[in-house]
Structure formats: C-alpha cells, structure tokens
UniProtKB/Swiss-Prot annotation:
Protein name: Large ribosomal subunit protein uL18
Gene Ontology CC: one annotated term: cytosolic large ribosomal subunit
GO biological process: translation
Recorded family membership: Belongs to the universal ribosomal protein uL18 family.
Keyword flag RNA-binding: yes
Domain of life: Bacteria
One Pfam family cited in the UniProt record for this chain: Ribosomal_L18p
Originating organism: Treponema pallidum (strain Nichols)
Quaternary structure and interacting proteins, as annotated: Part of the 50S ribosomal subunit; part of the 5S rRNA/L5/L18/L25 subcomplex. Contacts the 5S and 23S rRNAs.
Length: 120
C-alpha cells in the first residue's frame, strides 16, 4: 500500500500507523479522528471496542456544503461535532490527528471542539 503513495502521503501513512498503535477509543472515551482533503474536512467519533461511529460531521453534509477545507471552516466543523457529542452526553474524547500535523485545519477542528465543551 505504501509503495503506491507519493513521498508526502507515505510519510503521513507512517505517522498514522505509529499514532494508531497507541490511540484507542472506548465507549467512555471515544476516538475523534480528522480527515482532510484539498476541498473537504471530515470528523468522526469512533468507539473502537464496538467498531461503530458515534457521531460525524463533514463539509459534504447539506448544512455545510458551502464550507471548504480552511481554518475558519475547521472551527465551525469542530464546534458542530462538539455540539453533537454533548447531545449524546459524551464530553471526553481522544484526539486522533490521523497522521496530519497538528497545525492549520486540524488544530482548528480541535479548538472548535474544545470551544463547544469537549475535553481532550
């Protein structure tokens, strides 16, 4: 799988594998993972024990279709995932940056979720 990737993607995949060895979500403290592309942002909250997604937000959803993958959109996506988590009475998560550097859009999603009241 890594042979077909570019150098930049290969480095991200190596970071992702290294991070996922240590990061594991449970029902009490699920894993919040961020995916970003050049155009969109997607955030999922995953219970790894049950192998299920508890909540998700994406710029592909009808309410956020005008947003793109930039810092201001990342803040809005983070606040929305925070609201959805608090509705389900989940206030603590483990943040999984999914191999991306903790900078820009990824950091904005985390800040938005913290602003909504989620702890990690």
């Amino acid at each position: 799988m890594l042979r077909k990737c570019s150098d930049k993607q290969r480095k991200r995949m190596k970071r992702k594998v290294h991070i996922r060895k240590r990061v594991y979500g449970t029902a009490v403290r699920p894993r919040m993972t961020v995916f970003r592309s050049n155009r969109n942002i997607s955030v999922q909250v995953i219970d790894d024990d049950a192998r299920s997604t508890l909540a998700s937000v994406s710029t592909l959803e009808k309410d956020f279709v005008l947003l793109r993958a930039n810092v201001s959109s990342g803040l809005q996506i983070g606040e929305e995932i925070g609201r959805r988590l608090l509705e389900k009475h989940i206030d603590t998560v483990i943040f999984d940056r999914n191999g991306y550097l903790y900078h820009g859009v990824v950091a904005a999603v985390a800040d938005g979720a913290r602003k909504a009241g989620v702890k990690f």
